[in-house]
Structures are given as C-alpha cells and as structure tokens.
C-alpha cells in the first residue's frame, strides 16, 4: 500500500523523523518497501496566473502568454496545448533551477523573448510523462512557492503488507498502528451523519446474505460532475498510486484509502427498479469498466438490478452502470463481502483491483455506514446534491463473530523470554483495541476488534505483545535441547545418492517448471485428466505436470537447438494426478538420453544411444537399493510400441522406459532417437540391507547353451525360465550372442547363453551339472518351443 507521509501525520504525528518512522513501521512487522520524495529537488517555481494567450507570430504550435506572479507580469512562450487565459500553473521564473540542475534563463523562441517557463508535472518530476501544463486549483495563491503549496517535501511510503494485516490497508489502519507503537492516544476523526434532504430511497434486496452480510446504500440527486476534484484530493490520491478520474470516483477512492472501505457509485438513472445482491444465472455475461466482456462464473457474487448484472461484487463495476459526465443522480454502495466468498474470484477473471485486494483479506465489518457518511460529506462539498436517507440491509447471523482469545501470562514470558507484568501486557493490547473480556488468575480473555481478522489464538496475542515491545529488544538465547545423533536406517536410499550416481554416468540435473503446456501433456499422457490453472502465468504454463518428461523434453529441445550432440538429463520432482476427486502428488525420478553414446574422442567409436543404454543406466541405478529388478515389454502412449518396457520390483511395476514415439518427436521438433525413463521414488526409497556371504573356494562350472526360438520371444522371459529351472546352485547366467540367419530359419533367432554353477561347500559333480543343464533345455522347450541349435 502506498500513502503520503503528510496524510498519515494529519491523523497521528509522532515526534520522529521520516527515517525513524519508516524504521519503526518496518520493525513492527509492516515492511516498508520504499520511501521516496514526492518530487526531486527544484527551486524558484511559484504559482503563476496566465493573464492572456496570443498566437506566436512565427510558429503555429507556440503561444505567447502574459503571466503574473502576483507582483509582476512576464512574457512567456509556451507550446503546451492546454494553456489558457485564467488558469493557474507552476511558473519557473528566470533563475529557477529544475531537477538535474537545469537553470531557467532568458531566451528567444522563434524570435520572441521568453522570461521563464510554464511547467508540467513531468518538469516537476511528479510524473514520468505529461501531455500539457499542470493545472493548479483556481484558488491557488499566486506567487506562493509551488513546492510549499503542493507540499512536495512529502514522502511516499510503500508498505508491503502480509495478507493477515488487511487492517493496515488504509490511513486509518496505519495511524492506529503508529499511535500504538508510540503510545499516543488515538481517536479516529469523527464523521458526522448527513441528514437526509429528500426522501428518495432505492430498493435493495440481498439474496446471498452469507456472502454479503451487510449492504449500505444512499441516493444523492442533483450532483454536478463537471466540478473539478480539489487539488489536495488529487495529490493525496496520486501519492497513493491512484489516478484522478472524476469527482465522484475520486471520492470513493479517497474513502477507500482513508478508511479502508471500498465503495462504488452507480448512475441511478441506469438502474432498473432496485439493487439485488445475488449469485449469477447460468451463462450470464457482463461488460466490465475496462471494456472486457466476461461470462460470470457460477460461484461469483454479483450486484444486479431487476434486469441485468451491474458489477462483480467487490471486484469491478460494469461499463454501463458507472457514473459519466452526464450523470445527475447517483446511488452510493458500501458493503461488507465475506472474504471466503471473494477469495480468488478476481484472479479467475485475470483481474486484481484495489477493492478485491481489500475484500479478499477482510475489511472492518462495522465501518460501512461510516464510509458512506464520509463519502456523502465529501461529495456534497465538491459536487453538491441532495442526499436521501441511508439504506442498510444486515444479516447479523452471517457477520463474523468477535473473536474471544485466552491468553496465559506465563505463556507470554515463556515465548518471549522476557518478563512483562500483567499491567503492561494489558496496556499494550489495549493500545491495539483489544478489550479485556474476562480476567482469570493465570491470564485473561481478550476480545478482538472488528478490524482484526487475524487474531484468533493465543500466539496471535503474544505476537502483538512482541511487536509493541520491540522484536529488537527481545533477548537472544541459544536453544537448549538434547541433540542425540540418530543414524538413518541402513535400508534407506537417499535421493542425493541416486542423483550422484546418475551424475557419475554422465547425466546432468535439470530443474523445470511444475506448470507445463497442456498440449504437450495431451501427447505424453492422454489418458490422464490434467489439473489446469484458472489464471496461468502464460498459456504454455496452464497445466500441472502429470509426468516429468514434459519439462525434460523441452529442455532437450533447447539444448538440441544449441548444437548439443550428446544430451543426458535427469530431474526429480512431483507429478500431479487426479485420483478420486483428490490431487495425488507422487515424487518421481525421470531422465532422458539422446545423441552420441560417448563423448567424442580419438579412441571412441561414434555410436548413437539405443534402448540398452538407458536400460543399462537403470540397472546400474537400481543396484543401489538392491532391488529384485526385472523388465517386461509394455505399451505407453508416449513411447515407441516396440521399444517400451515396464520396470518391475519384486514383480510390481515401479516405472517405465523406452524410446520416445516418433510421432511425438516429430511434433516437438526433436531430431534422432530419444530414450526416456521415469521411476516412482517411493518404490525405491527402501532398499535391502546387504548381508555377508562368504566366497566359495570351490570352482565355478560353466556350460554354454545355444537355442533357437521365435523372434518375438523376449530374452527377459527366457532369462526368468533359466533362473527358475537351473537349480539352487546356479550363480548367474548371461546372454553373450544373438544370431539371425538362414541357418536358424525365418522368424527365428538364436540365443547363446552362458550358465554358471558353483556349490559353496564342495565341488559339483559332472552329473549334477548335466542334470541341471538338461532341466533348463527341457523347460525352455516346454515353455517357448525352443530347440538346441545344431
């Protein structure tokens, strides 16, 4: 929130310098992002009055003006399009020094002498750009220093408030806070009730009291919108980051900054028969003040009349019901909208307004009538008019209940590490408007004021005590606690260990966004119902990833486009799946390889990566947890139908690997074969604890087996059959050759496999090996129709 320091000091003026005030506010938990002078240094600029304007004899776009400083008249050549006789403007006389040490001197412009310069907001450093002279109020005293008249030695303070401190989104809230910090008695300025001059009321009906517990309105007839907004109000709004629009809108914005209550003004003559606060009808549309047409979501509260929607409640008004220069009668709205009903509504339409910012966090539900009286007072002063009586619709059962919070005196001392007597604690909290509801032997029950939505439990009160006491005054003590070192179970496999292993095999870690392109996800996981964002950062970041491949493939494309011919990447992170109406978050580990299998070198042969490279990497990786690992052929929509496998642990699927489907590779502009894997980390987080086995001193016995089987039979099935039939003394078996040719027949292949046996306590007999070998041959024949190769 931005505000003028002078404006704040009109409400409460502590005896502190600007720097000390900013530091105090920050140390109280209201972080000041910036505090800047309203205008950069300049001197010699006074309020001038333009007496006459004549055309320049030799330049169409220049004017020759007579300007008075209250004592003398000066001839000034001016090119501003809005210069006019009778207006009052900042006048830089000869000798004035503008920002940047630019000194005003007597000059001739196209042959006509100019004795000074008429200034715009840009020249006064009040704006980055301006289209013409800065008009001053008609009652501005001629000859007075502009810096003094506009109070340009003021500071703009920008406070970055946390969402729980919505009570400080106003001058009233900041003044309350500063008064409490400096022990200054504070009473908000009284707002007098304006008596009704006319009997006109506008019917109001609230159909959703749970979303709008209080609605206050008032008719004011006969307003004059041609009346200018006073200079003091324009300046206060500008220093709060709000541009002046017209007197009515400026007043509602002013009250919002002053009291924290957003308001809206409707053109009464554009409304049909009454105000209705309701939920929208299906498909209802509204053109907003910014010209954007929207279809109103079913959960969005609207302000309507009896024919059409007028505004998104608490967010933005509609284009056709706002005030204009033709408006003569207005209907003022001041309402309390429940924060939970407004949370996220503005963002769902891609909007963020000052009103929605306040309503989402919570406004004081007791201030709506006060705000409308303050706005009435200002409007009658500026645009005139005849006010009607105030209309108020209130559903007390739906208003927030005042929080009653218990506070133990001993707990205050315990958490803060400093002893504060009971009287001091009571006095501190009283300064913040917290009343003692009940006194007990060990503490109190406090009632929170209506503007503090963030106070609900004991630690909230202790935080307030700490803020007023001063965080910087709290003693610093080292925590004392037994810190026994508890080693992790040996079976636990850390993610860091897995990452380091992949790095040792030439992979590089990538970190990509969780939000990805919906189109990419529809290619990779078309069967999954993706989670989409209502208001994404960008159109290609609108969905939450269902696989880590989405980000890795984009990273691979980025590297490919930069002439990288060997890419090996991995990433760990969450994937997001819809399961039974809930969002399931699974920690995953994924990787990809493409390009050359080895870095280019004089002794390495050039070879492109293949399926067995990524399979070998996975086998090596999964040796860390000691998995009972196996693979089986599978199908995946993102992978090549003939080069896809499931990764199994103890027979249960834990991941998938394979070649990227050529169709997807072409769509994503990825060149050459690319191989991927993805594992569920939870499935490999618990490994097997290694157990010692003595090395047998007896010899190994190896037998080689060459069989002919169908081309389509995967070796993984053959390997499993060998393991199951070779007997208990089998140590291992390896495939060492694959042959295709006329000698084995069409649609056949020959597999050459070595099988090794060894007994831990004796030498195996030849007949035992022969029996085991024959069992293997028999099992392969029965299961796959395999025959020994002749």
Swiss-Prot record:
Catalytic activity as recorded in UniProt: tRNA(Phe) + L-phenylalanine + ATP = L-phenylalanyl-tRNA(Phe) + AMP + diphosphate + H(+)
Cellular localization per UniProt: Cytoplasm
Q: How is the cofactor bound?
A: Binds 2 magnesium ions per tetramer.
Gene Ontology MF annotations: ATP binding; magnesium ion binding; phenylalanine-tRNA ligase activity; tRNA binding
Q: Which GO terms describe its biological process?
A: phenylalanyl-tRNA aminoacylation
Going by the UniProt record, its keywords in alphabetical order are: Aminoacyl-tRNA synthetase, ATP-binding, Cytoplasm, Ligase, Magnesium, Metal-binding, Nucleotide-binding, Protein biosynthesis, RNA-binding, tRNA-binding
Q: What is its main location?
A: cytoplasm
Name of the protein described by the UniProt record: Phenylalanine--tRNA ligase beta subunit
The taxonomic lineage of its organism, from the top, reads: Bacteria, Pseudomonadati, Pseudomonadota, Gammaproteobacteria, Oceanospirillales
């Amino acid at each position: 929130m931005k505000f003028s320091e002078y404006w704040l000091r009109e409400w409460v003026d502590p005896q502190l310098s600007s720097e000390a005030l900013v530091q105090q506010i920050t140390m109280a938990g209201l972080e000041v992002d910036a505090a800047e002078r309203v205008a950069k240094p300049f001197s010699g600029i006074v309020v001038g009055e333009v007496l006459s304007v004549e055309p320049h004899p030799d330049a169409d776009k220049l004017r020759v003006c007579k300007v008075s400083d209250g004592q003398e008249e000066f001839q000034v050549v001016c090119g501003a399009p809005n210069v006019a006789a009778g207006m009052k403007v900042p006048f830089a006389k000869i000798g004035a020094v503008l920002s940047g040490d630019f000194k005003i001197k007597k000059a001739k412009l196209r042959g006509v002498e100019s004795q000074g310069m008429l200034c715009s907001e840009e020249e006064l450093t009040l704006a980055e750009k301006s289209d013409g002279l800065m008009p001053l109020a008609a009652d501005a005293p001629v000859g007075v220093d502009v810096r003094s008249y506009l109070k340009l030695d003021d500071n703009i303070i920008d406070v970055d408030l946390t969402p729980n401190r919505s009570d400080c989104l106003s001058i009233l809230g900041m003044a309350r806070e500063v008064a409490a910090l400096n022990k200054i008695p504070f009473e908000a300025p009284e707002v007098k009730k304006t008596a009704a001059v006319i009997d006109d009321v506008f019917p109001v009906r609230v159909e959703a009291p749970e979303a709008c517990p209080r609605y206050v309105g008032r008719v004011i007839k006969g307003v004059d919108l041609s009346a200018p907004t006073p200079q003091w109000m324009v300046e206060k709004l500008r220093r709060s980051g709000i541009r002046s629009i017209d007197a009515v809108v400026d007043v509602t914005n002013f009250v919002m900054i002053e009291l924290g209550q957003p308001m809206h003004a409707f053109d009464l003559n554009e409304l049909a028969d009454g105000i209705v606060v309701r939920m929208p009808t299906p498909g209802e549309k509204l053109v907003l003040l910014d010209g954007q047409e929207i279809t109103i979501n079913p959960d969005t509260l609207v302000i309507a009349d009896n024919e059409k929607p007028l505004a998104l409640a608490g967010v933005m008004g509609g284009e056709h019901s706002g005030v204009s220069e033709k408006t003569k009668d207005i209907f003022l709205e001041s309402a309390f909208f429940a924060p939970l009903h407004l949370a996220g509504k503005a963002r769902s339409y891609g909007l963020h307004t000052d009103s929605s910012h306040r309503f989402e966090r919570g406004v004081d539900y007791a201030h709506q009538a006060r705000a409308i009286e303050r706005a009435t007072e200002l409007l009658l002063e500026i645009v005139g008019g005849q006010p009607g009586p105030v209309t108020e619709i209130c559903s007390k059962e739906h208003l927030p209940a005042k929080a009653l919070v218990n506070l133990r005196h001993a707990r205050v001392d315990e958490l803060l590490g400093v002893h504060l007597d009971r009287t001091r604690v009571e006095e501190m909290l009283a300064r913040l408007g917290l009343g003692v509801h009940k006194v007990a032997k060990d503490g109190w029950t406090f009632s929170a004021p209506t503007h503090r939505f963030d106070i609900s439990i004991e630690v909230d009160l202790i935080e307030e005590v700490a803020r007023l006491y001063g965080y910087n005054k709290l003693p610093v003590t080292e925590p004392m606690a037994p810190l026994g070192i508890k080693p992790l179970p040996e079976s636990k496999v850390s993610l860091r260990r897995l990452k380091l292993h992949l790095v040792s095999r030439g992979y590089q870690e990538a970190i990509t966004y969780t939000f990805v392109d919906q189109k990419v996800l529809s290619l990779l996981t078309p069967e999954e119902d993706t989670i989409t964002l209502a208001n994404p950062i960008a159109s290609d970041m609108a969905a939450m990833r269902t696989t880590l491949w989405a980000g890795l493939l984009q990273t691979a494309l980025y590297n490919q486009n930069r002439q990288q011919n060997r890419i090996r990447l991995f990433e760990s992170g969450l994937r997001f799946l819809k399961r039974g109406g809930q969002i399931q978050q699974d920690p995953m580990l994924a990787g990809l390889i493409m390009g050359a299998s080895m870095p280019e070198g004089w002794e390495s042969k050039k070879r492109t990566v293949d399926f067995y490279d990524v399979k070998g990497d996975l086998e090596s990786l999964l040796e860390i947890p000691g998995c009972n690992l196996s693979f089986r052929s599978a199908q995946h929509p993102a992978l090549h139908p003939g080069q896809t496998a499931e990764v199994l642990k103890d027979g249960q699927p834990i991941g998938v690997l394979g070649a990227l489907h050529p169709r997807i590779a072409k769509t994503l502009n990825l060149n050459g074969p690319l191989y991927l894997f993805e594992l569920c980390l939870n499935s490999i987080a618990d490994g097997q604890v290694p157990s010692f086995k003595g090395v047998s001193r007896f010899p190994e016995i190896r037998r080689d087996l060459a069989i002919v089987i169908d081309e389509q039979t995967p070796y993984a099935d053959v390997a499993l059959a060998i393991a199951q039939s070779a007997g208990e003394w089998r140590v291992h078996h390896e495939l060492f050759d694959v042959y295709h040719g006329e000698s084995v027949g069409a649609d056949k292949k020959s597999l050459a496999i070595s099988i090794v046996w060894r007994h831990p306590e004796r030498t195996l007999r030849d007949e035992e090996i022969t029996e085991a070998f024959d069992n293997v041959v028999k099992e392969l024949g029965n299961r796959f129709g395999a025959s020994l190769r002749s």
